[in-house]
Structures are given as structure tokens and as C-alpha cells.
Amino acid sequence: MSSRSDEEILAAVSPAVVTHYHKIIAICVKHIRSSRLSRSILQKKADDLHDKVRARHFVDVVHRVAELYSRKLEESDRIDFDSMIGDAVQMVETGRYTSPFSLILVDEFQDISVPRAALIRALKHQQPFNKVFAVGDDWQSIYRFTGSDITIFTDFEANFGPSWQGRLQRTYRCNQLLADTAASFVQRNPKQLTKSVISSRPAIPQSIRVVPVRVEKYKETEAYRGAAMRILKRLDHHLGTQADEWKTAGRGKLTVLILWRYNMLDPFGGRPPTFDHIKVSGLSFHRSKGLEADYTILLDVSEGDYGVPSRIEDDELLNLVIPLPEEFAYAEERRLFYVALTRASRGVFLLVNEIRQSRYIHELCEVGPTAVRFETADGRKIDRCPKCHEGNMVSGRDADETPYRACSRFPACEHKVRQAIRSPAISPAFRAASTTFDSRRAGR
């Protein structure tokens, strides 16, 4: 039997599989070059993965691709960003470049990667009295997929030597109750640095509104779009009733951010609706970092593969080149939700699938009971199930028309309260007339 040609093999493979490996190879080549990873180092890492045979074959391919790409750049006298970092480290370490600066300032330090940390260390060690001044927030470290390694931040002294650690604890974005609740939530991971947050804005009770949404299969986007539109109309109407007072205070439109975990959930296809009194924009959780708005609406804060936290796992081949996942379950997903949660100054609406709310909803209720309110998209209060504390109490009728209140998570939760049918109120005059009538009947 003759072997298949490359073209025949490629034709037999699903396009989705080809696309997947294109992405994996591109990411790995980037990190191989920036971190100067040798084939032997990669093969050693491959032996630590679950599928060692697959990983070793992949190393042979991807390292060859990285070599060919590097050669192509050299032949065309070009340089890419990864070359800049790697070459800079080599030039500093070999003394080809001597920095005239004794103070190295680094912003957004929570996003630091191994190659960039190597460059900072090389610059620091050029002179005995060089200092590193780094500013960052480990609670907002959300870029592991680009090579960010949070341990470089949390283990600063192990990487850069003895240090002084200051605290920037004041926030000018969230109100105090929202800030406290979000801080308690993210610090449930014991590996996060402990901090207190002091807000310049006073606490606003029930700053977090949980809105259960009935979602039909394959119609998630439509369901969340409908609920989001009702909330937006509420906000626009509310501000409209205070338009004169708002304008007198010299304020512009109220700002609202609609946020989602994955871009496929964008309910407006990149074209958010316009209103008279509010300005609406939408983007992903990751892209919202650094932004703020008066209100935010977070979509599909529910359990599921593409939910919050996301259960989509990276291909283990990426562990050849990026930091290993943290031991604490969904550590980066927790930080990502924290980032999305803290974009609002006044309040945040969490739109959840009514039958599979995110585990984070229950946690928020535990750490901030006065911050959370359950309501419909129209603003009506919803009572939570007193048994499971996850579902909501909904009304219905049994086959015999007896009304009841039960948990929305049935049959997972069987809590149910049958409600007695009240008899109509009987007036004293009617009761007296009935007594007289009965007496006459008895006299017959």
C-alpha cells in the first residue's frame, strides 16, 4: 500500500482540526523564540504531559517550524516583537548594551511574562545599586494565554531580591459595597495577595442585581438580548424622569457597559442600541480591563462550558511553553470575573440562566448578602429558594388547580410549598341571614 501524500492527508483532516493546530503552533513558536526554549527543554516538558507520545511528536514539528521562521527573518533582515525581547536580554547580559538608568519603572506588572522578567533582571543586575519599582494588581492577572506568569508578581522577592511592598488601596471606580463584595470574592483564592479596598464612593445597597433568564436551547443570544434590552430601557426611562436635575448638574449621558465572556455572545453584533439618556457599549470581559461605566450588564453568568467560569480547557500542548495552571480551581477565571464585576461605579446586573446559575452567584451571596438582590429584567423582586439557595421561587398550579410555590431548579431541588385556597370572606349580615334560614328549615 502506497503512503498518502501530504495533500491527501490534509484533505482527510477536518478544517477545524487544522485551524486548531495552526493556532497552537503560532502560540508555541512565539514563546519558543521569546523564551529561547531549546528542543531538549521542550522534550523534557513533554514527558510531564498526559499524552507524552503526542507531545514529543508535536515538539519535533513545532521546534522545526520555529527554526525555519527564525531563519526566514534573518534572511530577510527583519525582526519581530519576540526577537526584540530575546535579543535585548542577550545584549544586556553580554554587556553589548549598558543601561544609563539606575531606576527601572514597570507598570501593569501583573501581566509580566518570563522573557520580560528576564530583561528586567538583566537590567537590574548590571549595576549593584539599580532598583526596580513595579506597580500592578495581582487580582487582575488575566493573560496567562499570552505567557503572563502571576507567580513572578506574587513571589516578587524570589525573583528580584529583598523588597518593600506598598499598598494602593483607594479606588475611584466602584462604590464601597461593590468593592468590598468583589474583594472578598477574589480573595477566596488564598494565593492572592491580601488587600483592603477603600472607595471614594459611598456604599449603594443591593449594587449587584441577579436577573434569572429563561433560555431555550440554541437561543441563548436572543434570550440575553431581550433581557438586556428591558434593563436598558429601564435605565433610560429612570434617567429620563430626572433629566432636568441631571443636566443641571452638568452631567452627560449615563454610561452602560454590556460585557460577555466570549465574543459569540455579543447580543447586538457589534452595533449596540442608542437611547436618549444612556450611552451603551459592549465588549468582552478581557477587553473591559481598565474601563469603567455607571452600570454594567454581564451576560450568561451561568454554569457551562462557555459560562462563568469557563470550563473550556486549553490544549495541554500549550503547557510546553506557558506557565502551568494554578492549583486553585478556575483561579484566572475568578480574577476575570472580578475584573468584569468591578467595571461599574453604581451597579451591575448579572444575567444568569435560571436553571444553571454560576457557582459564583452563590459565593457573592455568601460574601456580600446586603449587596445582592434577585429581580426580573423589569425590576420585580424574586425570592430565592430557602432549601438549595440557588434556584428561585416560582408560582404554579397542580393538576387539581391547587396553587404552589416551588424551586426553579426542579427536579434537582424538590422544594415545594402548596398554598391553601382561601374561602371568600363572609359578611356578618350574610352569616346572620343564613342562620335564620337554617332555623326556619329546622322548624319545618
Give short role names for the model-derived ranges.
Residues 114-212, 310:
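Conserved RecA-like helicase ATPase core segment
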